Design a protein with these regions (language model features):
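A late C-terminal transmembrane helix in Major Facilitator Superfamily
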Residues: 160-195
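Structural signature of the two symmetry-related core transmembrane helices
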Residues: 110-125
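Helix-to-loop junctions at the C-terminal end of transmembrane segments
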Residues: 95-108, 190-191
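Juxtamembrane intracellular "pre-TM" segments in multi-pass secondary transporters
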Residues: 16-48
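Extracytoplasmic gate region of multi-pass secondary transporters
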Residues: 38-86, 93-96
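C-terminal membrane-cytosol helix-exit motif in multi-pass small-molecule transporters
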Residues: 1-24, 210-217
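Intracellular juxtamembrane helix-capping segments at the cytosolic ends
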Residues: 147-162
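A membrane-interface helix-boundary motif in multi-pass transporters
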Residues: 1, 185-206
Length: 220
């Protein structure tokens, strides 16, 4: 307890530089205007917004599709297939913890590229895999690959509009609604052609992330 009190006192008397807030607030309309391509940063905010949608859509989509894939391809029981969700989150957590280490030894762009390649391999595996090993490996790959996409895209968007970071942050969080759009499209696709249709919808998101690679700055 004494250590906690001392730490609190030290923090209280430690000077902290605070960024002066911009004069006046921004309306919702002004924030949304940042999605319109403009001189300087071009369409980076819009591209980042779509990238966040794809990231969240793949995240939510994998959670809902992976167990169904195992049931459809391997005729598993629902209880056994539920392990797919746990496997995804295990590798997503591992990816989050190890991502900071890898970003110290490689560029942002290289790490982003490797992450997206993992996700593409995962989509191929989930689309054509017929064995437990292939499907489990694919689920693990998409979990690890998708674990650091959000912070990398988020940081690029913030760096593109340094004087409007609050507005950009809000827009990127709005991109989370991709978690509702993708499952809806995946549902339509799976009803039409089975779970491979849902995987193909997620693959479209992965392909979009490939197009975003050139927008990632190489510096850490």
């Amino acid at each position: 307890m004494a250590i906690g009190v001392i730490a609190t006192l030290l923090l209280f008397y430690t000077p902290v530089e605070r960024e002066e807030p911009s004069q006046g607030g921004s309306s919702f309309g002004e924030a949304v205007k940042l999605l319109v391509p403009h001189k300087g940063t071009g369409a980076l905010v819009l591209l980042s917004f779509i990238g966040i949608m794809c990231h969240v859509g793949i995240d939510v989509g994998t959670n809902t599709t992976a167990p169904k894939l195992l049931i459809e391809r391997l005729v598993m029981s629902l209880n056994d297939a539920a392990f797919a969700t746990s496997l995804y989150f295990i590798f997503r957590t591992v990816g989050s913890f190890t991502g900071s280490f890898f970003l110290r030894i490689m560029s942002n762009r290289l790490f982003f590229t490797l992450s997206v390649v993992m996700m593409l391999l995962a989509m191929i595996g989930m689309a054509v895999g017929e064995s437990k090993a292939v499907l489990y490996t694919s689920i693990a790959l998409v979990g690890y690959g998708n674990s650091n996409i959000f912070p990398l895209i988020f940081s690029q968007a913030l760096l593109s509009e340094k004087d409007r970071q609050n507005e950009v942050s809000g827009l990127m969080i709005m991109g989370l609604f991709g978690g509702t759009v993708f499952p809806m499209l995946m549902g339509f696709a799976s009803d039409a052609v089975g779970q491979v249709g849902a995987v193909l919808v997620m693959a479209v998101g992965v392909i979009y992330l490939f197009s975003y690679i050139s927008k990632i700055k190489t510096s850490n």
